[in-house]
């Protein structure tokens, strides 16, 4: 295709990218034509190291032949099955395989095609479950500030990030929010472990204020992305598990980002040894080769939806592409790749090395906190590490670092106050070194610029 035509303003203005202002994008457009391993290549032949797996998605790496061949073989057999009337062999096999790797008795799976679909489905499942088990008044959902659960209206209502939802308010009724465990900047001005996980106890306080008989579910990301990779302190998730159990509230993990090896285990629920009632999965579920997502839930929940057609207890939810055979084939191959190549262990090993290298960034005097587990890491930038004072908002320090890194050939997830790294789980030590070298150079230049 004609490169000049692809990057021409009149061509790009017809396209709407996610969360981007196109007038800014067309000034320096990034049009990628191919990818391999941990590398992208744009239409001009420039190579870019993928430091965030596309968008926390390509866990098994780009141009993975096992996944590609599995999808190709399925294309030769059947591309689409009627989701209202039937299923397909790869969908059945994928659900079986997933039941073997999900924690405890999360054995039943509803296949979907995107993360927002998964979180929507999880919250709807929770509400319908309570209605069908004699608790129709349990409809409210508790989530966390800074959390992001998707772009559809229900998922957005659970989202606690103001700039993602302001334009669409009012959002739906029945969604409540609490503070996440941002230990580096505790909103309660407490210090772990002396705090006795006070932030978890505020969830129970809210439940008691609202009335447990009105709360259907608590939904959260085990490791929060928005806010700069927010890590739960030891015992936090276990405490929430106990609270939800005591009040007969379903605990939902949004593992769209953290699933499939990202945190060093197949799921973050296993990394932190605290199992939810419903687990949302997506992104790394197929490594992005075909859109795929799903929810896995406990046997006791599944039992409430089993019956004859005349009982009308089936889960009242569905999507055209849910359980698509191409997506299921990709998911099966992806799961095999993660297991046979030991990518969970690799995530732990390379993640430790990544965080060790990130510590070197403290020499610049602008690193406040380094957070993460497995191949999921965040760096919070501060103007003064001693006082933890943030940069002046007008400096947009993290954005400048991220854009500088992209110019140098490294793709990251950046925000005014932090930057995140989550490369494909196949990344090598040498590629990790290169990633950190580029990031280091980018920070050095940005510091020099703002202090000039």
Positions of PLM-derived features:
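Conserved N-terminal phosphate-binding loop of PLP-dependent enzymes in the Aspartate aminotransferase
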Residues: 2-452
């Amino acid at each position: 295709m004609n490169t000049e035509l692809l990057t021409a303003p009149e061509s790009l203005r017809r396209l709407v990218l996610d969360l981007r202002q196109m007038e800014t994008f067309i000034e320096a457009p990034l049009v990628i034509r191919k990818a391999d391993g941990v590398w992208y290549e744009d239409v001009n032949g420039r190579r870019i190291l993928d430091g965030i797996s596309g968008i926390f998605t390509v866990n098994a790496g780009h141009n993975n032949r096992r996944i590609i061949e599995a999808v190709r073989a399925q294309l030769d057999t059947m591309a689409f099955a009627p989701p209202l009337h039937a299923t397909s062999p790869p969908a059945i096999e994928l659900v079986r395989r997933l039941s073997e790797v999900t924690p405890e008795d999360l054995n039943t799976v509803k296949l979907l095609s995107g993360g927002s679909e998964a979180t929507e489905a999880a919250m709807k499942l929770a509400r319908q479950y309570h209605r069908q088990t004699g608790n129709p008044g349990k409809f409210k959902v508790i989530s966390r500030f800074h959390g992001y659960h998707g772009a559809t209206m229900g998922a957005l209502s659970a989202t606690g990030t103001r700039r993602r939802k302001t334009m669409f308010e009012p959002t739906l009724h029945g969604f409540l929010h609490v503070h996440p465990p941002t230990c580096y900047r505790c909103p309660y001005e407490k210090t772990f472990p002396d705090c006795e996980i006070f932030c978890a106890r505020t969830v129970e306080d809210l439940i008691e204020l609202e009335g447990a008989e009105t709360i259907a579910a608590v939904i959260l990301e085990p490791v929060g992305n928005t806010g700069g990779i927010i890590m739960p302190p030891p015992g936090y998730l276990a405490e929430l598990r106990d609270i939800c159990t005591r009040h007969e509230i379903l605990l939902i993990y949004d593992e769209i980002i953290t699933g499939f090896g990202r945190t060093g285990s197949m799921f973050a629920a296993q990394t932190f040894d605290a199992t939810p009632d419903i687990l949302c999965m997506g992104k790394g579920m197929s490594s992005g080769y075909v859109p795929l997502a799903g929810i896995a839930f406990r046997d006791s929940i599944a039992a409430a939806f089993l019956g004859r057609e005349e009982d009308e207890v089936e889960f009242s939810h569905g999507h055209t592409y849910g359980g698509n055979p191409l997506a299921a084939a990709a998911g099966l191959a992806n799961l095999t790749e993660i297991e046979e190549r030991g990518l969970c262990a690799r995530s732990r090993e390379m993640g430790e090395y990544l965080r060790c290298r990130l510590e070197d960034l403290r020499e610049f005097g602008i690193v406040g906190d380094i957070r993460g587990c497995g191949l999921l890491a965040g760096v919070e930038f501060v103007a003064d590490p001693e006082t933890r004072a943030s940069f002046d908002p007008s400096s947009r320090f993290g954005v400048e670092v991220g854009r500088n890194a992209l110019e140098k050939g490294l793709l990251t997830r950046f925000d005014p106050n932090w930057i995140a790294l989550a490369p494909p789980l196949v990344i090598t030590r040498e590629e990790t070194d290169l990633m950190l070298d580029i990031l280091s150079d980018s920070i050095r230049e940005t510091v020099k610029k703002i202090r000039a």
